Amino acid sequence: MCGIWALFGSDDCLSVQCLSAMKIAHRGPDAFRFENVNGYTNCCFGFHRLAVVDPLFGMQPIRVKKYPYLWLCYNGEIYNHKKMQQHFEFEYQTKVDGEIILHLYDKGGIEQTICMLDGVFAFVLLDTANKKVFLGRDTYGVRPLFKAMTEDGFLAVCSEAKGLVTLKHSATPFLKVEPFLPGHYEVLDLKPNGKVASVEMVKYHHCRDVPLHALYDNVEKLFPGFEIETVKNNLRILFNNAVKKRLMTDRRIGCLLSGGLDSSLVAATLLKQLKEAQVQYPLQTFAIGMEDSPDLLAARKVADHIGSEHYEVLFNSEEGIQALDEVIFSLETYDITTVRASVGMYLISKYIRKNTDSVVIFSGEGSDELTQGYIYFHKAPSPEKAEEESERLLRELYLFDVLRADRTTAAHGLELRVPFLDHRFSSYYLSLPPEMRIPKNGIEKHLLRETFEDSNLIPKEILWRPKEAFSDGITSVKNSWFKILQEYVEHQVDDAMMANAAQKFPFNTPKTKEGYYYRQVFERHYPGRADWLSHYWMPKWINATDPSARTLTHYKSAVKA
């Protein structure tokens, strides 16, 4: 996890413009660099580094002697870089995984390059010989990338929007900033004056498609067919591989553990893989909650079962409320469910950074979208409609869950890794017949649970534990985070403010006092930037007015049972 920043065709003083890049310094606490492009005095790269791989020679922009005309600034991890290096017999100058991008590009061009990358990434690649600039982002948008471009060809890119909003450009007093779409790359012409012109924007990968790099994977041979035992065996193989490849780091590994199905499977598999790799330190797992929260109790059981070095972080309602302003600033969104769920993750990330030496943190993000884990999937009218909804959620992850996961950890200089969003695992899961993936017998993620039924990876009671939203599970059923927030915003937003909400906020008008409060905080930090969020996250098929699982009938009946 790092922070990247680049300008092309700036007409303002670069030393002043570079101050904007310091707004993402939290993403790279170990080192930073600014570098002008040779021959283009108005083009510049900025980089904030979190040293995870090759701490000695990992500074960016990456340049190697063999390709003096290539400049690469990227944030990500390319898990198959050694495999690609060996297969094509590339001669590396560093041990940095991103160097593979330069070699693949020289060999086959940008499309082949980006399709061969197994990992998560956001990059800016400059080819001064051919006068081209390339932008690219991974399939699910696990690594963030924002872009601002004017009609006269000024281009600015950054890992977070906050690094772009104060940039100056003579032709545009208000610079439009927008997220770069996941699963896409863009080709731009570089003009002699340093400005650019967009040539094409290409969608290179759909989450259902088996990625091109699968041809070179080390995964065990999968068995054909959709018999249940075959599918379960294939899923176990792919999930183990997804975790194993993500061990690539020179820093200590830890794992978020809420005690839910997803984080528990990740933690248990991770600990098993660390032992097989003969890593010489115990796995640290981290849980957060208020006293006697369901998550803390469940996480404790999992930690005892797998034998991790477990940490419990307690917080109270006052600490949660006080964190809201910092959280919304870090997130760059006012989406209700994203803000709610981010408070716990933000506070636990803060604890990890201050009190431990774990830097690379695993989590269970992405599973709910992939495996139809949200409670409202019980109401899907058909397996096909459930499949469509699952794919929609995956397409929009970059606006919600992976945004939350990235910003709350990056705010404290941590790197998050998400095995459930592995290309091979997710594409295989989505290839299964729709009827195999829907909730069964009143239980969501039935196939995933059944897959690990006989593995003894985690306790049975955790394997079959009903779905809890992270923002709900960190507090008690009697006094949920949802309820605490409602009581707080009731004193912050009055009825007159709500009556005038449509006039004050005509775009994405908040419908609740909680939504109004978050929007107020967001506008204070990012005035006029409401379009960064295209729509609120909301359950489907149930006419919900609030995204909390605690408000759903299925959840209430499950609690009573």
UniProtKB/Swiss-Prot annotation:
Residues that bind L-glutamine: 49-53, 75-77, 97
Glutamine amidotransferase type-2 domain: residues covered: 2-191
EC assignment: 6.3.5.4
GO CC list: cytosol
Site feature Important for beta-aspartyl-AMP intermediate formation, where: 365
Keywords tagged on the record: Acetylation, Amino-acid biosynthesis, Asparagine biosynthesis, ATP-binding, Disease variant, Glutamine amidotransferase, Intellectual disability, Ligase, Nucleotide-binding, Phosphoprotein
UniProt cross-references to InterPro entries, sorted A to Z: Asn_synth_AEB, Asn_synthase, Asn_Synthetase, AsnB_N, GATase_2_dom, Ntn_hydrolases_N, Rossmann-like_a/b/a_fold
Pathway: Amino-acid biosynthesis; L-asparagine biosynthesis; L-asparagine from L-aspartate (L-Gln route): step 1/1
Asparagine synthetase domain location: 213-536
Residue numbers carrying Phosphothreonine: 545
UniProt disease link: Asparagine synthetase deficiency: An inborn error of asparagine biosynthesis that results in a severe neurologic disorder characterized by microcephaly, severely delayed psychomotor development, progressive encephalopathy, cortical atrophy, and seizure or hyperekplexic activity.
NCBIfam families listed in its UniProt record: asn_synth_AEB, PRK09431.1
Protein name: Asparagine synthetase [glutamine-hydrolyzing]
